[in-house]
A protein has these predicted regions:
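Eukaryotic intrinsically disordered and solvent-exposed regulatory patches
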Residues: 14, 59-62, 110, 140-143, ...
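Charged, low-complexity intrinsically disordered segments
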Residues: 1-68, 73-105, 121-127, 180-695
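Acidic, metal-binding active-site segment of PIN/NYN-like and related structure-specific nucleases
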Residues: 147-174
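Two-metal-ion acidic nuclease core segments, chiefly of the RNase H-like superfamily
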Residues: 111-129
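A structural signal for short, well-ordered beta-strand segments and their strand-loop junctions
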Residues: 28, 74-77, 134-135, 155-157, ...
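Acidic carboxylate-rich catalytic motifs and surrounding loops in phosphoryl-/glycosyl-chemistry enzymes
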Residues: 77-79, 132-143
Length: 695
């Protein structure tokens, strides 16, 4: 939600706050506000796709600061969009605004666009640190306030609705939360902050009844109030003139309305006067609208999240709080949603059959980067919405629909199902309909029992969607399987097709991330490996300056945005399939400033292998990844007209069908699985001890 204009007014008036030394307490945190705030206020890259490794370190430092002051954090994340659609117009306007901001950033001007995988990185860091967190079914504001109300502890957020909720523990705006300035006094540490309480606020307006504040919020205008309602009231009411205080920002409408409300002893009398002023034949509907808005701020005595955090799981679900579309969903799915193991996309598709895709900084003249991951999203939608069990032979009847279509028998047993997608078209937000599709080879899957399906079957669904032959992953570490599969998918689903230098920079980025990940693990052979550290430092020096806004290569930015979209969708499909592949650490998958720097160096003539010179472990990893990708290319050419997972004996047929184009590509990209095997054998005996002997 959010009350229009209230944050700037309140934060500009120091007298509404008290200073607080935060320590030794529970703290309920608005997770979405936090990751936005941490990313945007720490100078991290927004133009080149984001620096997730640096962001993860910021998140770790934040929670380390809380821990040093004995503050116990409980993080609550937003879920899906409101099922009533009363906020959807606002969300569309924000999405349109972000399209223009992303375009502005791509041209070297100002804007704020959160990189696509930020939320996933944040969630994974919470898991790694053991920070308790939960995901709501829709907006988290009310659940956050309810939890803090029951626990009588403060809330940390950046949402002006918390100037309305009556919380005895108070509201701590992130603007004044100095987590990076921990103060030590004797044996105790504390974080300087400012606390807002409605009692103190109301005392500045003739000690007005604090129960009047919800009416104030609804009339002043929040995300759920129609603008015409606000305009109608303020065009008719006569507000008292308030003298402007020196040194404080002026907001005559807000101050005047608060003083006007302070004349009423209770909200009912004030509501009647408001309706009298607005009058007309719409009085009944206005009463209903305003009363519903006021109810949004009425907190219950207990919170369902308190039980969740006490027991690590919700034992039961209050169906009255669930959107209607979720009441019939399986319990395993609801548990994974509340635990954050499934994203808001799942909720939006189940409840509204809608997806609002996140804008990226890319070439606005080209189609959206999310077109590259369309087939992955179609499978996600199919698994969520096409729940009827299909008793049909998975390998028959694929005429007229191509590789991604449903078998004819499956089509006859299931009516078409569509999802509304909202995405960028040039500089406008466009609505399109996307048909949900069940996995071609396993159309009998049902969402109700998806978690009980054999992992081998779920893995085949994932590989089939990404068009990957499982055996070529045999030399790749399991936690890198998904990034490698996604990279293969990206290479063959993106337009324009990624260049060799782009593929190499993505793989070098994965190598860099893996080296950094292992260097941070005490006891790993790379933890104290000097040559590995040197290679990482050398690669770091190739980074683009995140503060440098101009001169971004939009072709590179667009292609890497396509990779991120494929990775984002691949992560979500893996989550929905209950992790048939290990989930990779997103913080180490992509660093935009590094990849842009690497691509420029590679395009300038440097060899990828030369950038890893002196670190055999790094070179072995790079060659293994490249060999796997080249294996995919080989298999893809061979199986262009054959279903995935078919026996290898038919490869020659497929190659003959492919013709001369396939031959040219085979000459250019030799190797395949056998090349990966040779490379693995060649470097298999090299360890960091070998490197140490040379130093």
């Amino acid at each position: 939600m959010g009350v229009h204009g209230l944050t700037s007014y309140v934060e500009g008036n120091r007298q509404f706050f008290t200073d607080l030394k935060l320590r030794n307490t529970h703290l309920v945190i608005d997770g979405c506000s936090l990751y936005f705030r941490l990313y945007f206020t720490t100078g991290l890259d927004q133009i080149r796709g984001g620096d997730y490794d640096a962001f993860a370190k910021v998140v770790q430092r934040f929670f380390a600061a809380l821990s040093s002051c004995d503050v116990s954090p409980f993080v609550v994340l937003d879920g899906g969009m409101d099922e009533t659609d009363k906020k959807f117009k606002t969300l569309q306007e924000r999405a349109q605004s972000k399209i223009h901001e992303a375009h502005s950033l791509s041209r070297g001007f100002h804007g704020s666009v959160l990189p696509l995988l930020t939320r996933e990185v944040f969630r994974q860091v919470l898991c790694e640190l053991g920070v308790p967190f939960a995901q709501c079914f829709s907006e988290a504001d009310f659940e956050i306030a309810s939890l803090a109300h029951q626990w009588r502890c403060p809330v940390l957020t950046n949402d002006s609705d918390f100037y309305i909720f009556d919380l005895c523990g108070g509201y701590l705006p992130m603007t004044f939360f100095e987590w990076d300035n921990v103060c030590s006094k004797a044996s105790e540490c504390y974080i300087p902050a400012r606390r807002f309480t409605v009692n103190r606020f109301c005392s500045h307006f003739n000690h007005m009844n604090k129960q009047l504040l919800p009416l104030f919020a609804v009339i002043t205008g929040n995300d759920y109030t129609h603008a015409k309602t606000t305009d109608m009231f303020f065009s008719r009411v006569e507000l008292p003139t308030v003298p402007r205080r020196r040194g404080s920002p002026s907001s005559p409408r807000i101050e005047g309305f608060l003083h006007w409300l302070s004349a009423f002893t209770n909200p009912l009398a004030a509501l009647e006067e408001v309706l009298e002023i607005m009058g007309g034949r719409q009085k009944s509907s206005l009463r209903k609208q305003l009363t519903a808005g006021i109810q949004d701020y009425q907190l219950p005595p207990t919170s369902s999240l308190a039980q969740f955090f006490s027991n690590s799981q919700l034992q039961t679900y209050n169906v009255l709080k669930l959107p209607a579309a979720l009441t019939s969903q399986p319990e395993w799915l609801l548990k994974r949603i509340t635990s954050g193991s499934l994203p808001p996309l799942v909720l939006n598709v189940l409840v509204l059959r809608r997806a609002l895709l996140i804008v990226q900084v890319e070439n606005s003249r080209l189609p959206s980067s999310h077109e590259a991951s369309l087939n992955i999203r179609k499978t996600i939608y199919g698994l969520l919405l096409l729940k009827n069990t299909m008793q049909c032979n998975a390998g028959r009847g694929q005429r007229g629909r191509g590789r991604g279509g449903l078998p004819e028998q499956a089509q006859s047993l299931s009516a078409p199902c569509f999802v509304e997608e909202y995405d960028r078209l040039e500089l406008n937000l466009r609505r399109t309909t996307v048909e949900a599709q069940l996995p071609t080879h396993h159309p009998q899957l049902s969402l109700n029992t998806l978690n009980q399906v054999a992992i081998s079957v779920r893995r085949k669904v994932l590989f089939g969607t990404l068009r990957v032959m499982e055996h070529v992953l045999q030399f790749v570490e399991p936690h890198l399987h998904l990034p490698v599969c996604v990279t293969h998918f990206w290479m063959h689903s993106s337009t324009p097709k990624p260049s060799q230098s782009l593929l190499q920079c993505v793989l070098l980025g994965l190598v860099y991330g893996e080296l950094c990940r292992r260097k941070a693990i005490f006891g790993d052979q790379l933890h104290a490996c000097a040559s590995t550290a040197t290679v990482c430092q050398n690669l770091d020096q190739l980074r683009m300056n995140s503060a440098q806004r101009r001169g971004v290569d939009l072709g590179v930015a667009h292609s890497l945005s396509q990779w991120q979209s494929c990775m984002w969708a691949g992560i979500y499909l893996n989550q929905l399939l209950c992790f048939p592949l290990p989930e990779p650490q997103s913080a180490w998958l992509f660093s935009g400033t590094l990849l842009h720097g690497l691509e420029a160096v590679l395009r300038g003539g440097h060899q990828a292998e030369s950038l890893l010179a002196g670190a055999p472990v790094a070179l072995q990893l790079y060659c293994t990844l490249l060999g796997a990708i080249q294996g995919f290319v080989f298999q893809n050419q061979a199986a262009q007209h054959i279903a995935p997972f078919q026996a290898a004996g038919t490869r020659g047929q497929g190659r003959r069908q492919r013709g001369t184009g396939g031959k040219r590509r085979h000459h250019r990209r030799r190797g395949g699985a056998s090349a990966a095997s040779d490379l693995s054998n060649r470097f298999g005996m090299l360890t960091c001890e070998d490197e140490s002997d040379e130093d």
